[in-house]
Amino acid sequence: MAGTTAGYIGHHLTFLSSGEGFWAVHLDTLFFSIVSALIFLFVFRNVAKKATSGVPGKLQCMVEIVVEWINGIVKENFHGPRNVVAPLALTIFCWVFIMNAIDLIPVDFLPQLAGLFGIHYLRAVPTADISATLGMSLCVFALILFYTVKSKGFGGLVKEYTLHPFNHWTLVPVNFILETVTLLAKPISLAFRLFGNMYAGELIFILIAVMYSANAAIAALGIPLHLAWAIFHILIITLQAFIFMMLTVVYLSIAYNKAEH
């Protein structure tokens, strides 16, 4: 662990990676995103296996509330077949929420635990890594194109990006540029919104942790600040998971809507 404040912050913001440059793989991001997915699958699978028609347990009630809530959102906003979109929305919300929630674990706990196994760098919050959020948003981007082609055909896709908003052949280049920028803005905004909020939240936790190494008065101030930020951060991690899920559903609805253009 680095001895200076700058070194401490830099240490906590360094990924456990393999390779260099563009091709570097952030192993910690990969590991914790997979663990988060397994937690989601384990919980929902167990609830589904133990579901009863009688009085449900607390966990079953919570899962049923989340499933019905998200199914209602999809039903209200997506007017096509929901056999894929509804499970996708549920997966996105729960997966992103679990990954975000890792940020509530004390910032030194997991890195120090990893240090016992000879791992010197570890960042545990996958959604504070732009490569992870971009990866998820690119998957959404691919689904947008898929649902556009599915509902309008390839010819409809071409028309959508060449004859809108100006329906004249002389303005095809202008239409193409405008629609391409609009299309690319969707995954980019999805990725950077989630990344920016979670990175800022992680950094604030690190800065508060720095206070504990100062004098007793500042260290004592850090305790209520840490608690207050953790409570507020619960709202942030939930809201960001909801926004990512909601925008995905809206974007897919726009792509599928045959009467859109």
From Swiss-Prot:
Q: One of this protein's GO BP terms?
A: proton motive force-driven plasma membrane ATP synthesis
Membrane topology annotation = Multi-pass membrane protein
What superkingdom heads the lineage?
Answer: Bacteria
Q: Kindly indicate whether the keyword Cell membrane belongs to this entry.
A: yes
Q: Which Pfam families match?
A: ATP-synt_A (PF00119)
Is the keyword Transmembrane helix assigned to this protein?
yes
Record PROSITE patterns? ATPASE_A
- Primary localisation category: membrane
Xref: SUPFAM superfamilies: F1F0 ATP synthase subunit A
InterPro entries per the UniProt record, alphabetical? ATP_syn_F0_a_bact/chloroplast (IPR045082), ATP_synth_F0_asu (IPR000568), ATP_synth_F0_asu_AS (IPR023011), F0_ATP_A_sf (IPR035908)
Recall the GO molecular function terms of this protein's record.
proton-transporting ATP synthase activity, rotational mechanism
Q: Where are the transmembrane segments?
A: 24-44, 85-105, 129-149, 203-225, 239-259
Q: Where in the cell is it found?
A: Cell inner membrane
Keywords for the protein's UniProt record, in alphabetical order: ATP synthesis, Cell inner membrane, Cell membrane, CF(0), Hydrogen ion transport, Ion transport, Membrane, Transmembrane, Transmembrane helix, Transport
One GO CC term, this protein: plasma membrane
Q: What does this protein do?
A: Key component of the proton channel; it plays a direct role in the translocation of protons across the membrane.
Subunit record text: F-type ATPases have 2 components, CF(1) - the catalytic core - and CF(0) - the membrane proton channel. CF(1) has five subunits: alpha(3), beta(3), gamma(1), delta(1), epsilon(1). CF(0) has three main subunits: a(1), b(2) and c(9-12). The alpha and beta chains form an alternating ring which encloses part of the gamma chain. CF(1) is attached to CF(0) by a central stalk formed by the gamma and epsilon chains, while a peripheral stalk is formed by the delta and b chains.
Q: Which NCBIfam families match?
A: ATP_synt_6_or_A, PRK05815.1-1
- Family classification: Belongs to the ATPase A chain family.
This protein is called ATP synthase subunit a
Organism ancestry: Bacteria, Pseudomonadati, Pseudomonadota, Gammaproteobacteria, Pasteurellales
